[in-house]
Amino acid sequence: MSDVKTSPAAEPQTAQPPVRPIAWPAGVAGVVLVIAGSFLSWSYDGSILNDLSIDFYPGGLQILAIIAAVLALVLLLAERGPLTAMGTWLDATLGLRALGAGLTLYMALIVVAISVESDGLINVNPGAYVSLAGAALILACAWMLPLRQLRDLSKARLPAWSEILAIAVMMAAVLFGAAYALGLTDAWSFILCLLFFATVIVALVRTGVITWFGHVGQRHKKVLTLAAFVVAFFFPFTQGGSDANMSIATQVLIFAATAIGLNIVVGLAGLLDLGYIAFLGSGAYVAAMLSESAFATIDWHPPFPVVVLIGACVAATLGLIIGSPTLRVSGDYLAIVTLGFGEIFRLAMFNLDGINGPLLTNGPNGIPGIPELQIGGFNFGDEHTVAGLELGRFSNYYFLLLILIAFVILVFARLNESRIGRGWVAIREDEKAAEAMGVNVFGLKVLAFAIGAFLAGLAGTIKAHQDAAVSPDQYIFLESAFLLAAVVLGGMGTIAGVLLGATILKLLPEKLRFFSEYRLMLFGLLLVLMMRFRPEGLVASRRRQLEFHEEDEELAVAVEEERLIVEEAK
């Protein structure tokens, strides 16, 4: 960090509490124990936790423990050693505490998992206990180290090429981490992998690395966006032709595209919509009715680009129809009306069966047998070989959905930065004040509903072909609740937050099916905890954080500094 620039006023103060002499050596000893234990076997049975039974040949979970130990060593060297210059910027002590706590919990759960799977603690090999002892020693060491006053990270600068390299390294870590996690079929291994990632992320947050990376992202926003899409593009090539994982990925993208549309309504305009899944369903039903399925009810089969536009426009029209009369109300009343609209849509799809109404949807049977998409001679149902790697039908739909996500993100970002977006935010903050300032409150509310519905309709047209069938039971209130949960969990008004929230709410139920009976209870508990401890969401903008923490003067200063950084980047 010798190239880091700072103002004289930002020079660090000396450490206050004295370091206990034993703390640092104990931490290094803990690192050595974790690594040494990871090279020993942790269980006798090779079928447990993807085989941790071979000495001097670490398995996947053992390698993760080694990585955590190496990170702990880096933080120790930042506290005392050749990396102390970095330690004047990053809070090594807080990071080490988070890493030590997470690693101790990780090793304890591994011991529990092995004992449960092999019927007793006696079947846990000594290597696991050695690593557990090392993790506990790292944690104890971290609490003996003093806290320091640090330089202001917002003033940290590296050469542009170094910051771009940091973005590339971070994105590569995300790609390989996601590929490894999705490749785990054992539930215990997947949970432990998630715990490892959570530990590393929390440690990086506590040290300040994530804050610094946020400033870097602001300075190189285009590079970060490009890197994110490059990672997403190469993701199918890491799955070895696995249709199971790519099926999950396509569902995540459909869910995310729809959630970003809802984010316009909820996150920007502040309108609570509990029936949003109906707009996704309207797009899907339009695509199904205009498809070449033997059960399609309309004898007209236009090209898919035309179908996409029709489906999106039908959804937007429904948004206008529901929005125009109902947006005169607000708050709880609006939520009740939109909830009713979602149920009306589902019941209408049940009744348009040729008996209770016109024959459009085949009633509860839906429209099955929807053929694969075919655009310009390219059949999305065919397998293709690229660079020796097999890409199945779900990979084909994944790339199409990636284009859709790029479009949806572009629309959201442009609207958010436009006069319309500022009008929505003004309405969300104080509707009466916005109206007094001349903002067309009703018009902007209706526009938010229409644009959000349009984007959901786009996703629905692709979903119909990807699922090969549509039925009313796919578009129940619970799906609207999960969409709203994705927006709230990730961070209202943000793009990255909604993408993260959508990924969590779609991925975890698929990988943790043995928790299916408790899914709703766990998600409800998660939302309650979020509302209590982080109401702004996992990835909230600084301004959104300030809305929930008005008393935080340091946060207010950080918001202003972030604004200056953005202006400087422009």
Question: PLM features: what roles do these ranges have?
Answer:
Residues 1-25, 75, 79-102, 124-232, ...:
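Cytosolic-side transmembrane-helix boundaries in multi-pass membrane proteins
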Residues 69-72, 242-294, 324-334, 338, ...:
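Single transmembrane alpha-helix segments in multi-pass membrane proteins
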Residues 97-104, 110-113, 277, 300, ...:
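Transmembrane alpha-helical segments in multi-pass inner-membrane proteins
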Residues 117-125, 269, 276-320:
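Membrane-embedded helix boundary and interhelical linker motif in transport proteins
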Residues 119, 152-153, 180-191, 345-386, ...:
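Extracellular/periplasmic helix-loop junction at the C-terminal end of a transmembrane helix
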Residues 275-281, 328-353, 361-362, 474-488, ...:
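Pore- or pathway-lining transmembrane helices of multi-pass membrane proteins that form conduits
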Residues 297-343, 500-501:
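Alpha-helical transmembrane segments within multi-pass membrane transporters and channels
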Residues 392-471:
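Helix-loop-helix "hairpin" substructures at the membrane interface of multi-pass membrane proteins
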